[in-house]
A protein has these predicted regions:
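Ligand-binding loop in jelly-roll beta-barrel domains
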Residues: 77-101
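Basic/polar N-terminal segments that are highly enriched at the extreme N-terminus
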Residues: 1-10, 100-101
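Short beta-strand segments in beta-sandwich/barrel cores
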Residues: 24, 33-35, 51-56, 72
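Short beta-strand His + acidic residue motifs that chelate non-heme Fe in jelly-roll/DSBH
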Residues: 34-36, 54-55, 80-87
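A short glycine-rich, His/Asp/Glu-containing loop-to-beta-strand
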Residues: 8-35, 42-45, 93-96
Length: 101
């Protein structure tokens, strides 16, 4: 990660937090981009709404994929990226950070 990038939060708002987990919500309208952000903890993403999302890592390239509401995925800490709603409908997810990771 380079220091020349201003980093934002991994989501729009914190829904819950205790000493073990922090739960975020992220909402992106079609074409909207999240701020560049860095994942400092392992986390689980649960898709709530949406049909397609693109992730643009700081390092280079992008990964685009269809998403299905209700689907969840575990991801390791360390990524620095921008999320883009590349779909036709609103994208919303819940991210659960594992604070002891």
């Amino acid at each position: 990660m380079t220091e020349s990038h201003d980093l934002g939060p991994i989501g729009d708002r914190v829904l819950f937090e205790d000493e073990q987990i922090r739960v975020w919500e992220m909402v992106l309208e079609p074409g909207e981009r999240s701020p560049m952000h860095h994942h400092t903890h392992d986390y689980i993403v649960v898709v709530v709404e949406g049909d397609h999302v693109t992730v643009e890592p700081l390092e280079a390239g992008s990964k685009s994929a269809p998403v299905v509401p209700g689907h969840s995925v575990f991801l390791r800490k360390g990524g620095t990226e921008v999320a883009v709603n590349s779909g036709a409908v609103r994208y919303r997810d819940v991210q659960i950070e594992l604070l002891d990771s």
